[in-house]
A protein has these predicted regions:
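Generic start-of-chain signal for non-secretory N-termini
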Residues: 1-22
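Soluble acyl-CoA-dependent acyltransferase catalytic core bearing the H(X)4D motif
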Residues: 1-7, 26-348
Length: 348
């Protein structure tokens, strides 16, 4: 058994019917040279890669009485008909129809008794192409691990395929712990955590002294963020929109402004939000605050889990202003350094 970290488990605890912790991506493919049996070939392609990543073969097992975080266990009875599905758009198969279908699929929570992932191959695009929608649970992995998963999944070179057909995993060498053993282990882990509390308090106190004014400045964001038309109760329905940006263009803008790609993306998002709020006559006087995920993953770390923190970044009121962007970038970098230090002390 592989116990989830507190961060991974938080995505389980925070899930509600209105806010399933699904993460997804959509890949759009050009019309295939051989359009026959596209789904069957995709299913075989996916099945041949099931042993390359632990994500595909593991499911959650809850701890008795909720005494500890859930754990990952091997699923020896994987049902590919549940995990790899087929859908089709009605004619004419526009992008709006694709977005509407993906929104409906993304609103459906994943079954926690099965491995937490699904692929949908969606046919019927108006140009003859097809799309693949990949859905997984945030407790599985973060964005960096997600990209590594897609790199392995969408590598269609002949030398990337496994040398042998997929195997059904052998039963675990040790049987799954029974209720008494799991409970005993969970209680022991809980007591170890209690004994570690004095050290945690010392670490927190030291971190607070080191962070000083930066901590007060960043935490003040939480109290100065204005309320907008987005601050409403979330329903079970989802909307899905898309936009395309040229990565070379984004890199060129970042280089010209001596900022990062993340800075450019934040400026684009801030500009879009500003335009939307102006059009709806609800632009607040104070700037908005964005919670931006940032990776804490060390180079070469390929584990399938979450290693990230959230940076609180104040969005410029005039994000397209060159002066505003140049002034905001050093301030944001300073606040990011503060939060990175907080994360290194176990606060992230």
């Amino acid at each position: 058994m592989n116990r989830l970290s507190a961060l991974d488990a938080s995505f389980i605890y925070g899930e509600t019917p209105e806010t399933p912790m699904n993460v997804g991506s959509v890949a759009i493919f050009a019309p295939p040279a051989n359009p026959d049996d596209v789904f069957a070939r995709f299913r075989d392609h996916t099945a041949a890669r099931l042993d390359l990543l632990p994500l595909y073969r593991r499911r959650l097992e809850m701890t008795p009485l909720g005494l500890d975080h859930p754990a990952w266990v091997d699923d020896d009875d994987l049902d590919l008909d549940y995990h790899i599905r087929r859908a089709a758009l009605p004619k004419p198969g526009t992008m709006n129809q694709l977005r509407a279908l993906v929104a409906r699929l993304h609103a459906i929570p994943l079954n926690h008794t099965r491995p937490l992932w699904q692929y949908y191959l969606i046919e019927g695009l108006e140009d003859g192409g097809f799309a693949v929608y990949f859905k997984f649970h945030h407790c599985d992995m973060d964005g960096v691990a997600h990209m590594a998963t897609l790199d392995g999944m969408y590598d269609f070179s002949s030398d990337s395929a496994p040398a042998s057909p997929p195997r059904k995993p052998a039963p675990s060498a040790a049987p799954s712990p029974d209720f008494l053993e799991q409970t005993t282990t969970a209680v022991a882990d809980f007591l170890r955590q209690v004994r570690s509390l004095p050290n945690l308090v010392t670490t927190l106190a030291k971190a607070s002294r080191n962070l000083g004014r930066d901590a007060q400045y960043s935490l003040a964001y939480l109290w100065k963020t204005p309320r907008t038309r987005f601050n409403v109760a979330v329903s079970t329905q989802r909307s899905y929109g898309t936009a395309s940006l040229s990565l070379p263009d984004v890199k060129a803008v970042a280089k010209a402004g001596n900022v990062t790609i993340n800075d450019v993306v934040l400026a684009v998002c801030a500009g879009a939000l500003r335009r939307y709020l102006i059009e709806h006559r609800s632009l607040p006087d104070l700037p908005l605050t964005a919670a931006v995920p940032a990776s804490l993953r060390a180079p070469g770390d390929t584990r399938m889990n979450n290693q990230l923190m959230f940076l609180l970044c104040r969005l410029c009121k005039r994000p397209c202003s060159t002066t505003g962007a140049r002034h905001a970038a050093p301030q944001r970098q300073s606040r990011c350094r503060f939060l990175a230090r907080a994360g290194s002390h176990g606060l992230g």
